Amino acid sequence: MTSMILAVFIFLLTLVLVIWQPKNLSIGWSACGGAVLALIAGVVNFHDVLTVTGIVWNATLAFVAIILISLILDNIGFFEWAALHMAKAAKGYGVRMFVYVSLLGAIVAALFANDGAALILTPIVLAMVRALHFNEKLVFPFIIASGFIADTTSLPFVVSNLVNIVSADYFHITFIDYASRMVVPYLFSLLASIIVLYLFFRKSIPKRYDLTEVKKPVEAIKDQNMFRLSWYILGLLLIGYFASEFFSIPVSVVAGSIAIIFLIAAQKSPAVHTKKVVKEAPWAIVFFSIGMYVVVYGVRNAGLTDVLSDVIQAAADQGLFAGTIGMGFIAAILSSIMNNLPTVMIDALAIAGTDTHGMMREALIYANVIGSDLGPKITPIGSLATLLWLHVLSHKGMKISWGTYFKTGIILTIPTLLITLVGLYIWLLIIHSCF
């Protein structure tokens, strides 16, 4: 009983420090501090630390590499170029631009992770719609769409979200196996997200805008040579992802190698300050992931994940549909309350403790990922990316209160989550009946 109380106390204390970040305390320090406390208290041992490090090292380093690549692309104007093309392609129609910007966000989230989409694309979209002289009421839908779509469409590939990488690594799921299960739910989520966003904001989206106010996409490019090279880098990255499975190469090695090549090339570019790019990379995530997982392992050692295993087992016993929907909403609710990274870790441990196999086990694993990817949009504390996204927006004069965020988030997230989980359920039935 004492170890259980200690494990819960250390977990909650670490979580509060991570979310609150008093005096700008790094999330890495908070999580590692919690891990040290867990070691001192005896709720984990050094063998647990080694086990955890073995689980998360690939995930975190791959994530850092993807963000490094996206930061270089941002520096050379790649994402602004893409956003301006969307605005031009919409030909002055507001709703069309709203949809196109959402589609761009979905592509960026899929290839460059949700954090890259939310933190890089949102300021570009904000600057673009302000340049079109939209008032704040008309700007709001585009900003929320950029942030919302970044998480709801970060499903299709292992590298699209740190949550995905952590879960795939824990259950030893390869890049192709993961994509084969999640690309279809991703399409469900994308379609549902755009429909829900449009229905919610339809009265606030301008019918028309002045196309002459949109600058030429080519003007956004700050280095033509690096811009041309970036297409080869992206092609190499995609080939590397798929090839990694056949050669049993960790995704982090593929992404990391390409990030290093891109960084070396960027040193010659006047548009990219490589030292600044390296400094801006989310290195704290490495220490946060290891430290937080150690703390979560303490909760597991205390037997609390067994309780969650029983709840998940009860849902699974009701059949595939109930198991899929139940697991997804459990993950979403927990993510919205205590952040999605600890949630996906705890849920993975709990799923491993259930008596499930085959299609049911797959449904639980992928529903957990979906819930942990989408659930954070319900509350501002659901993900670190959302907290940082709100902070970036406030610095650019776009303040969104937690109340406004929650009211908007819960209305948008619940139907999107349900539709995506139904998509997963249908796709798993098709896969297992046809192949």
Curated annotation (Swiss-Prot):
Keyword Membrane attributed: yes
Topological relation to the membrane, as annotated: Multi-pass membrane protein
Pfam families: ArsB
Places the protein is found: Cell membrane
Gene Ontology annotations of biological process type: response to arsenic-containing substance
InterPro entries (alphabetical): Arsenical_pump_ArsB
UniProt GO MF annotations: arsenite transmembrane transporter activity
Origin superkingdom: Bacteria
GO cellular component: plasma membrane
Keywords, ordered alphabetically: Arsenical resistance, Cell membrane, Membrane, Transmembrane, Transmembrane helix
CDD domains: ArsB_permease (cd01118)
Primary localization class, coarse: membrane
Family: Belongs to the ArsB family.
Protein name (record): Putative arsenical pump membrane protein YdfA
Lineage of source species: Bacteria, Bacillati, Bacillota, Bacilli, Bacillales
Gene that this sequence comes from: ydfA
